[in-house]
């Protein structure tokens, strides 16, 4: 089963979570990693920031992505690193 079929067959995922997963999958490098900010994801998919955050949480909870915090040299946060599993 392809990743596309697997995502669409999973009834635990909302439409917004599927859209965000496809967005991340499309932007991931060869190792499955990408780092768009929530604001960028929301803008590109025409979602509210909160809806994008909920979709990311749903994907992490169901094991479709892994989310790791990233930090600048001064210790402030920047966009998360997402790994598409």
Task: Map each language-model feature to its residues.
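Intrinsically disordered, low-complexity basic tails/linkers immediately adjacent to helix-turn-helix/homeobox/MYB/SANT
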Residues: 75-85
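Short recognition helix of helix-turn-helix/winged-helix DNA-binding domains
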Residues: 1-66, 72-77
């Amino acid at each position: 089963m392809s990743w596309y079929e697997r995502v669409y067959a999973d009834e635990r995922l909302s439409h917004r979570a599927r859209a965000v997963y496809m967005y991340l999958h499309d932007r991931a490098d060869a190792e499955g990693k990408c780092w768009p900010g929530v604001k960028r994801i929301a803008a590109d998919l025409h979602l509210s920031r909160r809806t994008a955050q909920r979709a990311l949480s749903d994907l992490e909870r169901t094991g479709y992505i892994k989310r790791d915090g990233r930090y600048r040299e001064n210790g402030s946060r920047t966009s998360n690193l997402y790994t598409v599993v």
